[in-house]
């Protein structure tokens, strides 16, 4: 049984010039323990597909039709409140360019702490300890120091590792 199944997904955006069909009939599945690479030209809908799965579309974007079955639930029908519990806890995405996903005004620790505080009820001190553990898990050298840094102070590869740690959190 697939962990994630996308059936005939259609994601559209309302614009002043009309409707833009960003994702038009995409279907695929991912089995537990397997990896799926989504490849396509720039502007072909890869990122919009991922944003649709996580329900992170801009205000003018919407899922017009299709199903996003994750762990037996159709995420297309899940409320915003329930999706906040699922997103970052049960399902995550690691974006290609981490600098656009990390907030430049917050430290790595602050950003990585959020899932532990929100989803696991940890206090800030407990979450800070867990952040260092996560940074160690993705083989970031000197994780205590890196946790106190801002994204712009890290190399692209280090930012990517931070995003992997965030997805695993």
Model-derived regions: residue spans:
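ABC transporter nucleotide-binding domains
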Residues: 1-169
């Amino acid at each position: 049984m697939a962990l994630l199944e996308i059936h005939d997904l259609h994601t559209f955006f309302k614009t002043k010039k009309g409707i833009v069909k960003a994702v038009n009939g995409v279907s695929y599945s991912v089995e537990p323990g397997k990896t799926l690479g989504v490849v396509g030209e720039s502007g072909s809908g890869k990122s919009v597909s991922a944003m649709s799965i996580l329900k992170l579309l801009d205000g003018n974007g919407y899922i017009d039709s299709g199903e996003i079955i994750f762990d037996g639930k159709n995420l297309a029908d899940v409320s915003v409140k329930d999706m906040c519990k699922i997103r970052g806890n049960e399902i995550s995405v690691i974006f290609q360019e981490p600098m656009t996903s990390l907030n430049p005004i917050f430290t790595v620790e602050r950003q990585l702490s959020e899932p532990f505080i929100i989803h696991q009820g940890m206090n800030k001190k407990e979450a800070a300890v867990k952040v260092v553990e996560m940074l160690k898990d993705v083989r970031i050298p000197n994780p205590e120091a890196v946790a106190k840094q801002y994204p712009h102070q890290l190399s692209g590869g280090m930012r990517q590792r931070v995003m992997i740690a965030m997805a695993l959190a």
